[in-house]
Amino acid sequence: KAAHKPRPTFAILCMGLICFIAFLSEGAAMDWSGIYLNTQFKVQASQAGLAYSCFAALMVAGRLSGHLIIRFFGEKNTILYSATLAGLGLLTVVFAPVWYVALIGYAILGLGSANIVPLMFSRAGRQTELPKHIALSYVSVFAYTGSLLGPALVGFGSEIIGLSQVFFIIAVGLISITVLNQLTSAPATAAEAEKTQTPA
């Protein structure tokens, strides 16, 4: 008789939802940032790619310095600050009066988004309520669904309510990660890991 795969816990579902939102915002920046600059600010195609360049550059910088950031702020606060920063970055894009302010917003979004998904995968691997490989598989489904379907969802939504409004909704979703993060700490191992990663 085939073994029954355990159902995801509430904490795992929250981790997955966090990854979905984070990858959704990455997809929005990757596939729609240039279009946004062109439609909102009439930026030429030769310059529209700067939006994703700013996003990607700060994301890489954030990833490379992630271990230092986590060591300084602790895991819990890193996610809290990262989600807030990412949300504010995308809101900067939405309310930017000129296109180069939107570039700053995309850069802030990239920096804020850099460590959210890696930390969620790490937390899923440390929890003890489900086998590690099963927990990671559930979180991966959410994460890569956001990555694959995100750009299409943004496009579909933009046809209905407009691209700025879609970005605003995603920004609210990013900020909501600060709440969802509190719901992923049920396993005792997460609290223990927080002690080891937070400076005395």
Tell where the protein language model's regions lie, with residue ranges.
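Helix-to-loop junctions at the C-terminal end of transmembrane segments
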Residues: 62-74, 158-159
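A late C-terminal transmembrane helix in Major Facilitator Superfamily
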Residues: 129-163
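Short amphipathic helix-loop junctions that connect adjacent transmembrane helices
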Residues: 31-47
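Intracellular juxtamembrane helix-capping segments at the cytosolic ends
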Residues: 114-128
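Paired small-residue
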Residues: 89, 100-108
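Pair of pore-lining "gating" transmembrane helices in MFS-fold secondary transporters
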Residues: 8-25, 107-111
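Small-residue hotspots at the loop-to-helix junctions and early N-terminal turns
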Residues: 45-53, 133-137
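Structural signature of the two symmetry-related core transmembrane helices
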Residues: 77-92
